[in-house]
Amino acid sequence: METLNVSNVSLTYPGLYSDQAVIALKGVNLEIKSGDFVVALGASGCGKTTLLNLMAGFMAPSDGEIMLGDRRITGPGADRGVVFQKHALLPWLNVIDNTEFGLKLRGVDKATRRDLATRNLALVGLQDFHRHMIYHLSGGMQQRVGIARALTCDPAMLLMDEPMAALDALTRETIQELLLEVWQLTNKMFFFITHSVEEALFLGSRLIVMSPRPGRITHTYELDFNKRFLENGNARAIKSSRDFIDMREEILGIIYGDELQSGNPELLHA
């Protein structure tokens, strides 16, 4: 069973002058095991995406280290799949060619990569869209292709940076439910960033709340709303339950504090 360990990680962005350095993260510790669905919440600029980029190997910490199993993360790798807010698919390739693209780069033979891509497209409900071009798909379907592409390389971990931020509400709920089914079937590690408290509560088996810069993990919650959904399939009932609503209000209060008390309508519907 794989484990990702973030150990006392800090990141400082140097400024033009020494007094202009920006401390993005400070002393972050986090453990994620196979089967964990960890969701990160926090106000804009708190370092959520920076932490994900460090896990992905897109950048290196100023202090501390990140280990995946016994391997120190020093760059991107096939053991971590990334799904971005924008799908990052190749528009000149069709759905199945996009899905198997990572395996092709690794030199996997065509029959094997086609089989893996076919299975993962079926997993996200796109078994009938192999030959469709990316620009013919809706935003939700494009994100499904992105998820299938990440899964096809069989990573130990999926890193997802607000993958549903640009989707309409109905599509967003559909993809949320799909993600939980994928999580249940694959038992992979998930690290998911969102600005929606409702989405975080529904998806996560663990929720971390990060402070404004310098980003630190200030609160951790163990959750089971996702398992309740997988047992009964009624997302609306879960999201309207008293304990779900109470938890939502508590976390909104932590993140936004006085702003929430002022009645800002954007926050009240977060």
UniProtKB/Swiss-Prot annotation:
Any Pfam family the entry gives: ABC_tran
UniProt-annotated location(s): Cell inner membrane
Catalytic activity: taurine(out) + ATP + H2O = taurine(in) + ADP + phosphate + H(+)
GO MF term set: ABC-type taurine transporter transporter activity; ATP binding; ATP hydrolysis activity
Keyword Cell membrane: yes
EC supergroup of this enzyme: translocase
Function per UniProt: Part of the ABC transporter complex TauABC involved in taurine import. Responsible for energy coupling to the transport system.
Complexes and interactors: The complex is composed of two ATP-binding proteins (TauB), two transmembrane proteins (TauC) and a solute-binding protein (TauA).
PANTHER family assigned: TAURINE IMPORT ATP-BINDING PROTEIN TAUB, TAURINE IMPORT ATP-BINDING PROTEIN-RELATED
Protein name (record): Taurine import ATP-binding protein TauB
